[in-house]
Structure formats: C-alpha cells, structure tokens
A protein has these predicted regions:
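Alpha-helical transmembrane segments of multi-pass membrane proteins predominantly involved
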Residues: 1-266
Length: 266
C-alpha cells in the first residue's frame, strides 16, 4: 500500500493460472530486488528507512486484510490477502535494515516467509482453479459443501488457509514466527502487535471459507480435479506441512543463504 490498487481487479479478471503467477512469482522476485537494494545500494541510509518500511508494513497489512474481510469472492479475497502478506514480509525487512549481527534473523524471516508462501499460495489458487473449472465461479457459494463434493480438495484447502493464517504445524506459522520474532528481537513491539492484530483479522475471513466448505448445505455436483492439479496440490500440501512439522532442514538452508547474502552485502 498504497500501490496495490491494481492487484485485486487484475487477479479477479485474469485466468486463475495467471493470478497464481502474479501473486507468487512476481511478489517473490519483487522482494528479492527490494532486499538487494536495501542491503547493498542503501546501506548507509538503512536506519533512516526503518520508520518508512515499518509504516508501509502496517498500512499494507491493515488495508489488505480489512479489504479482504468484505469479499464474497474467494479469488478476490486471496488477492487482497496477498497484499496483506506483503505487509508481513516487510516486517522482516525492517529487522534486516537494522543491519547488526542479529540482522540475519530478519532476513531469515523474509526467506522463510517467501518459501512457505510460495507453496501455500500456489496450493490455494490450485484449489480455486479446480472449483472454478467445475462450477464456473469463484464466489464463496461455489465452495459450500465442498467437503461432500470433493473431500480431498476441501482438506487441502484448509491446510493452505491455516498456513496463510499462521497456525502451528504449517509452513506459514514458521514464516510468521521468524518475522514476528525478528521484530520483537529488535524491540519493534508495536510493529509485532500490529501484525498480531492483523493476523486475527485474517483468521476471521479465512475461517469463513472453512465454514462454508464444512458447515453449509451441499450445492452442485461432485468435483473432480484434473490429475495435473491433483499432483501439484499433493506436492504443495506435503511441502506446507513438512515445513511446519520438520522445519530444521529448511531453517538450515535459510541460515546458509542468509549468511551468504549478508556477507556479500557487507
């Protein structure tokens, strides 16, 4: 925020595969560039940029979450949710820009968050794609009774929504834990508090979709996702749960990557 206005309409109007790419690959690349600029090009001014990034973080997550709260279209809801996720990632960049020996914690948070977000968001959009192919709609009404029409899709979508919320035993929790932890470690308590409040708001609209899938009357015919989508969904689900249940391996990878990035920046 406030440069997100194009995103919801673009995601909503684009074919779901294109929206998936825009919400994951482009965002990951953008944050890689931003981190590179702040760690190398703006090193002498990093302290001055901290209030700006912190303010953008709060504004971005708040505007994204409260806009998502009003949506009845799941695809559009995830578009605004993607805006809010960018705000959480900015929290990690705030900790990185303090650039002390513990700055690695903020960079770890950014990398972990992006890694978890990649599988979680791709998986969520794949479920939307499968539902849209059968029903022709991405409105929340198309997801009503999904547990009866396609139990596997419903369960995997719950995993992705819980990960986006930041519930333990998911990759999203690992990313949020490191990002929020970095903010607290650098004594940005107010920033972490804003993040927690926003996470609570996000939980409401994510769980609203879960309620529609599990606790509303079944409508429409059974859903059968194409085999390609099924395989991709299984990969995303396993990766999301693996990062939450057995995080040690990915943490080692991220520690190594963070150390190398900071060594180059210094």
């Amino acid at each position: 925020a406030p440069f997100y206005q194009w995103a919801p309409d673009t995601y909503d109007g684009s074919p779901t595969p294109v929206a998936t790419y825009l919400s994951t690959a482009s965002k990951t690349a953008a944050f890689a560039v931003i981190a590179r600029v702040f760690l190398t090009g703006l090193t002498p001014f990093q302290v001055e940029w901290v209030p700006v990034l912190a303010g953008l973080s709060i504004i971005t997550m708040t505007m994204g979450n409260f806009a998502a709260l009003r949506q009845n279209n799941v695809k559009r809801m995830l578009a605004y949710s993607s805006v809010a996720q960018a705000g959480y990632i900015l929290m990690g960049l705030v900790a990185v820009t303090t650039f002390s020996t513990s700055g690695m914690d903020g960079l770890n948070g950014v990398l972990l968050y992006l890694f978890a977000y990649l599988f979680t968001n791709v998986g969520a959009f794949l479920v939307i794609m499968a539902v849209e192919e059968t029903t022709g709609s991405t409105d929340i009404s198309a997801f009503q009774g999904l547990i009866h029409k396609a139990p596997g899709l419903a369960v995997m979508f719950v995993v992705f929504l819980l990960s986006l919320t930041g519930i333990p035993l998911t990759g999203g929790f690992l990313g949020k834990f490191y990002v929020f932890g970095a903010a607290v470690q650098h004594q940005y308590y107010w920033l972490a508090a804003a993040g927690l409040i926003n996470a609570g708001v996000a939980a409401y609209y994510y769980l609203n979709v879960v309620r529609a899938m599990f606790f509303t009357e079944e409508k429409g015919e059974a859903l059968h996702a194409p085999i390609g989508i099924q395989i991709s969904l299984i990969i995303c689900t396993v990766a999301t749960l693996w990062m939450g249940v057995y995080p040690s391996t990915v943490i080692e990878w991220v520690n190594t990557a963070s150390a190398q990035i900071l060594a180059v920046a210094q």
